[in-house]
Amino acid sequence: MRKIAVLTSGGDAPGMNAAIRAVVRTGLDKGITVLGIERGFDGLLNGEIFEMTRRSVADIIQRGGTILRTARSEEFKTEEGQKKATDILRVFGVEGLVVIGGDGSFQGAKSLSELGVKTIGIPGTIDNDLAYTDYTIGFDTAVNTVLDAINKLRDTSTSHGRASVVEVMGRNCGDIALYAGLAGGAESIIVPELRFDIDKLCKTILEGKKNGKMHNLIIVAEGAGKANDIAKTIEKVTGVGTRATVLGHIQRGGSPTANDRILASRMGNRAVELLLEEKSSRVVGINDNRIVDMDIHEALSIEGKFDEKLYEIAKALSY
């Protein structure tokens, strides 16, 4: 293995830069040339490829986003686009490709591996929705971003005796809502994995009001409901003033936490090691604080891993 390349694809996540840094510096330490591909698979199709050095990744471990930038590509989803991508990699002499991203990015890596490209995937997505790994890069930072916001919302909700409904990211996975809700002492956590009863929630809010409760904090994953709709219903049924807050893309930004920087560094290092071991079509993950790897087809076939025990703990501590 003499030359490898790295790209970031799909939605950005804090810690991607730390992973890029680890891939580049591990590769250079092993005497490998490392190329950077800008703007994901779209940039690959346009030949946006350059050689990276140690200076290329200096002072980026603390930065959010991705220095390689990211984009989505409709052309790459076609057989012709994937064949074009493999030809471009061959022209540049790339013998191994590291793909940092989420489920869609891994699907792209899988397609390239089936065309003979040696690929390794690193999970970078704030949603934590890849079931084969305990945590994905960016998740911890996103949870802490949400926690900071709900701490502030709790202050103003208490002052006014209101309820706050906070909508966070998570179309199919409620982990951000669950972890931030538990850490922030939310009274209710609404996730796509579990059925939600608005009438029961309103009844609980009324009981709390009768017992002197000064505020209510409800966290909802975007795939489970809309904060504005839930807030309107709560206010109409209970008479309690209720405000909705949609945190949106702020959850993707910001300097990564120590946990995300360390996780990304470990995963990036292992990805290069796997290529040097002549392994391909693998994804890196973490289980029980051990860096592991798995066949990409198997990893993508594993179903969701929602932690119902953690949810029950949050529920027990909520009122």
Swiss-Prot record:
* Gene that encodes the chain: pfkA
Q: Where mainly found? A: cytoplasm
Question: What is annotated as the active site?
Answer: 127
The protein's enzyme class: transferase
Question: Which is one Gene Ontology cellular component term of this protein?
Answer: 6-phosphofructokinase complex
Q: What is the lineage of its organism?
A: Bacteria, Bacillati, Bacillota, Clostridia, Eubacteriales
Binding, ATP = 11, 72-73, 102-105
Q: Tell me, how does this one assemble? A: Homotetramer.
Keyword rRNA-binding among record annotations: no
**What's its job?**
Catalyzes the phosphorylation of D-fructose 6-phosphate to fructose 1,6-bisphosphate by ATP, the first committing step of glycolysis.
Give the catalysed reaction(s), semicolon-separated: beta-D-fructose 6-phosphate + ATP = beta-D-fructose 1,6-bisphosphate + ADP + H(+)
Q: Which SUPFAM superfamilies match?
A: Phosphofructokinase
- List the pathway annotation: Carbohydrate degradation; glycolysis; D-glyceraldehyde 3-phosphate and glycerone phosphate from D-glucose: step 3/4
Entry protein name: ATP-dependent 6-phosphofructokinase
Locate the residues binding substrate: 125-127, 162, 169-171, 222, 243, 249-252
Going by the UniProt record, its keywords in alphabetical order are: Allosteric enzyme, ATP-binding, Cytoplasm, Glycolysis, Kinase, Magnesium, Metal-binding, Nucleotide-binding, Transferase
Which species is the source of this protein? Clostridium tetani (strain Massachusetts / E88)
